[in-house]
A protein has these predicted regions:
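Basic/polar N-terminal segments that are highly enriched at the extreme N-terminus
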Residues: 1-14, 43-62, 406
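C-terminal segment of N-terminal export signals and the immediately downstream linker at the start
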Residues: 20-24, 45-80, 87, 97
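Conserved, mostly hydrophobic/aromatic
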Residues: 94, 100, 159, 172, ...
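Shared catalytic-loop signature of beta/alpha-barrel
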Residues: 147, 274-281, 285-289, 296-394
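N-terminal secretory signal peptides and thylakoid transit peptides that target proteins
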Residues: 9-38
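Flexible C-terminal active-site loop/helix
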Residues: 32, 36-37, 41, 60-75, ...
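Metal-dependent enolase-superfamily TIM-barrel catalytic cores that perform enediolate-based chemistry
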Residues: 175-286
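Metal- or metallocofactor-binding catalytic centers and their adjacent structured scaffolds
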Residues: 60-68, 84, 96-97, 102-170
Length: 406
């Protein structure tokens, strides 16, 4: 397992900052030599992407260098929602390099996003990031990425995450510090229990012993059985995610009253995202907070959700990454809405990126890396159920095994 390395030592002969600037040092060199910059990336993660140069797509030039390679996430259990089941999730891992420093990102694409490895690699192949010779032009770079073609939010998020990781390394700081967030304020993360048979549900609950809140997938005829099965095994607080599975508002309200008696603390996306009036009625009468997920994809959706939901679930793969997620968080708080920072099934790369925002969120659902069996990274940790940020630059990522190859 490898760790980030920092360069804290300066030679006695190193010129002063003013002398450096006077000698025409670039801003990047100035930042690097004044000790704000981490050394050039992760040795272990570098080996993880070593095969990219030969096998992957690549755009290069004097500016940013983008590399990407397909990956498939293997789920520990079949993942069943209200309307679908799957055992794998398609993914694309990317790297973004500048002057020997590398940032990492990923695009995780569950079916409902409408993206695929083919669409993501096609999108990434169209990007000309070599035109940018200064990674600190983050707004310009990400506006360009978003403008290339519509949709492709997960693919765009992969570039956004890698750029944030890169810039954080150039600054020598994790993003939660750059944003001024207190790592002590991170919430507990929920652990997801997908729809399954009572026997498998009990097994999943047993695996989730370290977690202080469980997220239960509902939206089928077995909803009450799911909750009763879980309650027979644990008394920890629950939240439920219906994934648009309830269509009758009165039935939904009756169910929420019953769920409150069972120790549920909030309800996520109980009705279809198109049922706006019904959802607003349900929120008005609900004894529990309601959270919009599928209804809230990007920044313009936050204002639309006000009055329809009590809060929103922000996911990097929906909103094109950390930049817009931070904007959504800020806007939601200004509207007095609650915020959950969520995820898809993802590696520790995207989870660590999302975790940088968690200190300002009421809830976290950052277990996507815990639901897969082939996570190539190590990043944010969960300690006694609590999201625990790492004081490492960028998003705080390292490779689990320096010999690991794609």
């Amino acid at each position: 397992m490898t760790n980030f390395q920092k360069n804290h030592n300066q030679s006695d002969s190193t010129p002063s900052p003013s002398e450096r600037v006077g000698e025409g040092f670039s801003r990047r060199n100035f930042i690097r030599t004044t000790g704000l910059t981490a050394l050039a990336g992760l040795a272990g993660t570098e080996s993880l992407f070593a095969a990219m140069k030969k096998k992957s797509g690549k755009t290069s030039g004097k500016g940013l260098i983008l590399r990407f390679i397909p990956y498939e996430l293997q789920l520990r259990h079949t993942f069943t929602l209200a309307n679908s089941s799957r055992k794998t999730t398609p993914d694309v891992l990317i790297s973004l390099e500048f002057e020997g420093v590398t940032g990492y990102g990923e695009a995780s694409m569950p079916p409902y996003l409408g993206e695929s490895i083919e669409s993501a690699t096609k999108f990434l192949s169209t990007l000309n990031l070599s035109q940018f010779n200064d990674p600190f032009q983050m707004d310009d770079i990400l506006k360009y990425v978003d403008s290339v073609m519509p949709g492709n939010c997960a693919a765009k998020a992969s570039v956004d995450i890698a750029l944030h990781d890169l810039v954080g390394k150039l600054m020598g700081q994790p993003w939660y510090k750059i944003w001024g967030f207190d790592p002590a304020d991170t919430p507990n993360t929920s652990f997801t229990i997908g729809i399954d048979t009572p026997e498998v549900v009990r097994q999943k609950v047993a695996e989730a012993t370290p977690y202080k809140i469980l997220k239960v997938k509902l939206g089928q005829k077995t909803d009450r059985e799911m909750i009763e099965t879980i309650r027979s095994a644990t008394s920890v607080p629950l939240c439920v995610d219906v994934n648009q599975g309830w269509t009758d508002k009165q039935m939904a309200l009756d169910m929420i009253h019953w769920l409150k008696e069972k120790g549920v603390v909030f309800v996520e996306q109980p009705m279809p995202k198109t049922s706006i009036d019904e959802m607003a009625w349900l929120t008005e009468h609900s004894p529990l907070p309601t959270i919009g997920d599928e209804s809230v994809q990007r920044l313009p959706d936050v204002v639309k959700a006000k009055g329809v939901y009590n809060g929103i679930n922000i996911k990097l793969m929906k909103c094109t990454g950390m930049r817009e997620a931070h904007q959504m968080l800020t806007l939601a708080k200004s509207l007095d809405m609650k915020v959950m920072i969520g995820c898809m099934t993802e590696t520790s790369c995207a989870i660590s990126a999302a975790a940088q925002l968690s200190s300002k969120c009421e809830w976290a659902d950052l277990d996507g890396n815990l639901l897969i069996s082939n996570d190539p990274y190590q990043g944010v940790q969960v300690v006694k159920g609590k999201v625990t940020l790492i004081d490492q630059p960028g998003i705080g990522l390292s490779a689990l095994d320096p010999k690991w190859k794609i």
